Amino acid sequence: MFTILTGSQFGDEGKGKIVDLLSKDYDLVVRFQGGDNAGHTVVVGDDVYKLHLIPSGFLLDSRVLIGPGTVLNPEVLAEEIDMLEKTGVEVSSDKLGIDAKTSIIMPYHVELDSLRESLRKEKIGTTKKGIGFAYVDKIARDEVRMSDLVDSEILMNRLTEMAASKEAAIRELGGDPSIVTDSELMDKYVKLGQRLAPYVTDVSYEINKAISEGKNVLAEGAQGTFLDVIHGTQKFVTSSSTIAGSACANLGVGPTKVDEVLGIVKAYITRVGEGPLPTELHDEAGAHLHDVGHEFGTTTGRSRRCGWFDLPLLKKAINLNGYTSVALTKLDVLSDLDVVKVCVAYDLNGERLDYPPEDTSLLSMCKPIYDELEGWSDDLTGVKRYEDIARAAHDYVEKLEGMMGVPIKYVSVGPGREQTFEK
């Protein structure tokens, strides 16, 4: 079975938690896009793991793979491996694989990203991790690949070839071009390549072989649907395609092999950084969602903007991803609100819209049209079965499912493994 899992909103929906829950049933868990600009949190008992590159299935028996559609900072990956091994989690080459075609984020990518953002009159909210510039080099066929990194001679030749153009680009943006040929940095990357060499594999081959043998494969997306480089809220997006279809293209798996597409949906909506968020709240309800939900970005630590559930956006996410089911997370955060609202449509200059406009500037002008539901005061964090949640919470979930037209398969009421149950 081949399952694709993506975030349906702007990221931070709780994908890592759901992947961790499902991983026990999957032989392979694979990351298919993004870089260390995305973060996922896995909570097991008192242990909290915050990772950016290693897929969420690392704590169970699954083999975890980093696919060629990702961009990889080898220093960050080495730090994650060290962190896990210090907590007693072995990260051997039997456990982790990295595709040979994976693009490497170099120090000059990070420098260029920071310089470009600092010069923008209107910030786009980049994490300044070098993600976009690494993808630019991939498209320009000017990248350093994982297969280059692990061969010191090829690596040095590639860096020598690109030095002049990278130095010129940094100089043009007012930076110090010496970072491109810094001998200490080059030595560091040579050593990183040597360390990571045992992990190199062919991810497409591994996945297709596993599927043909009747094994289960889970493709784990990063970020969220509306950060997609094509279909997201341009220009406030990431540099990769975050929707389900890109899993097949990036991993080299034919679309006829997909069995299930699972969307992760937060019971409200959040966004880190700039860009339109039609239901954004600046009142006590917004403060409640932010504080009770601990809404701070895993990667940046920035405060997340919070708003009510946005049905028009979710309708589009369902179309873009083809969800067969969804997991609803953070339902517990809505407890103790007198009223819970759902945005069912937008008002754009007097016109009712049931679906988001394509133009980002128009989306930012949309005013939400709400349905109001009764709130609840019950603490849901100890609930183990869907049948036992508060009546008003039950009504909220049923209303969302009815409006979405896609079955809610899982409901989450807290960060722990035991706080997610099937509906």
UniProtKB/Swiss-Prot annotation:
GO terms for cellular component: cytoplasm. It comes from the Archaea. IMP binds at residues 12-15, 37-40, 127, 141, 223, 238, 302. GTP binds at residues 11-17, 39-41, 304, 330-332, 412-414. Keywords: Cytoplasm, GTP-binding, Ligase, Magnesium, Metal-binding, Nucleotide-binding, Purine biosynthesis. The active site is at residues 12, 40. Mg(2+) binds at residues 12, 39. The gene is purA. Substrate binds at residues 298-304. It catalyses: IMP + L-aspartate + GTP = N(6)-(1,2-dicarboxyethyl)-AMP + GDP + phosphate + 2 H(+). It comes from Methanococcoides burtonii (strain DSM 6242 / NBRC 107633 / OCM 468 / ACE-M). Binds 1 Mg(2+) ion per subunit. GO terms for molecular function: adenylosuccinate synthase activity; GTP binding; magnesium ion binding. PROSITE patterns: ADENYLOSUCCIN_SYN_1. This is Adenylosuccinate synthetase. It is found in: Cytoplasm. Plays an important role in the de novo pathway of purine nucleotide biosynthesis. Catalyzes the first committed step in the biosynthesis of AMP from IMP. InterPro entries: Adenylosuccin_syn_GTP-bd, Adenylosuccinate_synth_dom1, Adenylosuccinate_synth_dom2, Adenylosuccinate_synth_dom3, Adenylosuccinate_synthetase, P-loop_NTPase. Belongs to the adenylosuccinate synthetase family. Its cofactor is Mg(2+). Homodimer.
